[in-house]
Amino acid sequence: MWRLLSPTALLLLVSAGTRAADLSKAMVVLEPEWNRVLVSDGVILKCEGAYPPGDNSAQWWHNGSVIPHRAPSYSIEAARSEDSGEYKCQTGLSEASDPVQLEVHTGWLLLQAPRWVFQEGDTIQLRCHSWKNKTVQKVQYFQDGRGKMFFHKNSDFYIPKATSKHSGSYFCRGLIGNKNESSEAVNITVQGPPVPSTSTFLPHWYQIAFFLVTALLFVVDTGLHVAVQRDLQSSVKEWKDGKVTWSHGP
């Protein structure tokens, strides 16, 4: 089958396969990294992905509807409840990103974390965020209703190496002025170590190497085929011309 394809055609196939391997998903990145914010908080969403030379525009979606905004970042200066929902983006050289959920809450305190599902051994960071960054004192973090950490001044709570026992419902409490305020409870899940997937053993560079090796083998095979045919044609011509000399053993 390979001999039916010209080198140009094979190179086109290799190029197409390489481009397909190169086409990756864009990614929405939140700054700050919290996906739960309070009303009036500022949020910047950035679209990370491959951009064509000279074109850094991006397409944005909010809850499935196109946002009339083409910049690589999308800013929400003062979040409102209607800003909640799923956000997606796409660059000129990438597939559409997976959706990222943004939740806009009302209240005095809000528990924040970079994510809510962790692997065993991960560091868990919890933040007791106040509306308009008002001063909070005597902050306490709770897991399943039990106090886990207390700070006289508002500070983040870190769990260095998460285990399954750290899964549960968390909230924070603190004093704003002379009022004792509490955040809503949020569930945190700690999963076991991830199982290696097949894709782990077939990284992106492996796919490119596969196409290159295939092309190289084709070139070698084609060269041998041409050389053998040329030698056979030469031998047949010499035989017809009577130039072949037979040697007999002693």
Curated annotation (Swiss-Prot):
UniProt topological domain (Extracellular) ranges: 21-207
One function term, GO molecular function aspect: IgG binding
Keywords: Cell membrane, Disulfide bond, Glycoprotein, IgG-binding protein, Immunity, Membrane, Receptor, Repeat, Signal, Transmembrane, Transmembrane helix
Signal sequence range: 1-20
Record topology, Cytoplasmic segments: 229-250
Cysteines engaged in disulfide bonds, as pairs: 47-89, 128-172
Site feature Important for receptor turnover, where: 221
Protein's membrane topology: Single-pass membrane protein
CC terms in the record's Gene Ontology section: external side of plasma membrane
Localization (cell): Cell membrane
CDD domains in the cross-refs: Ig2_FcgammaR_like
Membrane-crossing segments per the record: 208-228
Domain Ig-like C2-type residues, every copy: 32-105, 120-189
Pfam families listed in its UniProt record: Ig_2
List of glycosylated residues: 63, 133, 180, 187
Keyword flag Plastid: no
Stretches assigned to coiled coil: none
Alphabetical GO biological process terms: antibody-dependent cellular cytotoxicity; cell surface receptor signaling pathway
InterPro entries named in the record: Ig-like_dom (IPR007110), Ig-like_dom_sf (IPR036179), Ig-like_fold (IPR013783), Ig_Fc_receptor (IPR050488), Ig_sub (IPR003599)
Assembly and oligomerization: Forms a heterooligomeric complex with ITAM-containing signaling subunits FCER1G. Interacts (via transmembrane domain) with signaling subunits; this interaction is a prerequisite for receptor complex expression on the cell surface and intracellular signal transduction. Binds the Fc region of antigen-complexed IgG.
Function field: Receptor for the invariable Fc fragment of immunoglobulin gamma (IgG). Optimally activated upon binding of clustered antigen-IgG complexes displayed on cell surfaces, triggers lysis of antibody-coated cells, a process known as antibody-dependent cellular cytotoxicity (ADCC). Does not bind free monomeric IgG, thus avoiding inappropriate effector cell activation in the absence of antigenic trigger. Mediates IgG effector functions on natural killer (NK) cells.
Protein name in the entry: Low affinity immunoglobulin gamma Fc region receptor III-A
Lineage of origin: Eukaryota, Metazoa, Chordata, Craniata, Vertebrata
Name of the encoding gene: FCGR3A
